[in-house]
């Protein structure tokens, strides 16, 4: 099948793109508003775009009412955020933070997560996350209806148990989760791994 983009409706394009560009890592972004309200939200339009220094990218849509999501507003206001990685142990809590809450709601409390003080940014890390990247805003780029945010990592926090003495990642201990299309996710460990 072929789909001419200009002749294909938005719902179909959304379904195709999200179902075909897989698996996608999940950036679980924690921010703080200028008024001190904590926020967490997961994004699967996410990846790393540079390694030295590390630069991460998230792409965020608007709310259904076409207003900015809290993550975008907070990042543009404070110029900083933390990208936490999702592992199997926190998967259910991540799903809670993916629900749309009013700006005054603290998602840490809603999901039963612990804010952990960051070293270089005001936004807290998620203590339960095995990996966190403290980021300062590198660049903001609007792309059609999306808000693309690039963050330069200032610090990478990694749980000791997932790295060996040579700093290789043990995926059986990390147990990362990725996003597929629809309501499907994938475990990026165990028999799913292919070694070449």
Swiss-Prot record:
<comment type="similarity">
    <text>Belongs to the flavoredoxin family.</text>
</comment>
<dbReference type="GO" id="GO:0016646">
    <property type="term" value="F:oxidoreductase activity, acting on the CH-NH group of donors, NAD or NADP as acceptor"/>
</dbReference>
<keyword id="KW-0288">FMN</keyword>
<protein>
    <recommendedName>
        <fullName>Uncharacterized protein aq_928</fullName>
    </recommendedName>
</protein>
<keyword id="KW-0285">Flavoprotein</keyword>
<dbReference type="Pfam" id="PF01613">
    <property type="entry name" value="Flavin_Reduct"/>
</dbReference>
<dbReference type="InterPro" id="IPR012349">
    <property type="entry name" value="Split_barrel_FMN-bd"/>
</dbReference>
<dbReference type="GO" id="GO:0010181">
    <property type="term" value="F:FMN binding"/>
</dbReference>
<dbReference type="InterPro" id="IPR002563">
    <property type="entry name" value="Flavin_Rdtase-like_dom"/>
</dbReference>
């Amino acid at each position: 099948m072929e789909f001419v983009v200009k002749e294909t409706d938005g719902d179909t394009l959304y379904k195709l793109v999200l179902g075909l560009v897989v698996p996608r890592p999940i950036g679980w972004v924690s921010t703080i508003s200028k008024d001190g309200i904590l926020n967490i939200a997961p994004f699967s339009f996410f990846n790393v775009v540079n390694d030295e220094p590390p630069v991460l990218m998230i792409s965020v849509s608007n709310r259904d009412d076409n207003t900015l999501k809290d993550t975008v507003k907070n990042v543009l206001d404070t110029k900083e955020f933390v990208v936490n990685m999702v592992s199997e142990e926190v998967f259910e809590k991540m799903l809670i933070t993916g629900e749309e809450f009013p700006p005054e709601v603290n998602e840490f409390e809603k999901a039963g997560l612990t804010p952990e003080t960051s070293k270089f940014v005001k936004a807290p890390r998620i203590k339960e996350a095995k990996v966190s990247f403290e980021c300062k805003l590198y660049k903001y780029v609007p792309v059609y209806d999306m808000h693309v945010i690039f963050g330069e990592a200032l610090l990478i926090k990694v749980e000791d148990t997932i790295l060996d003495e040579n700093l290789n990642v043990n995926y059986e201990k990390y147990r990362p989760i990725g996003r597929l299309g629809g309501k499907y996710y994938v475990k990026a460990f165990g028999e799913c791994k292919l070694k070449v």
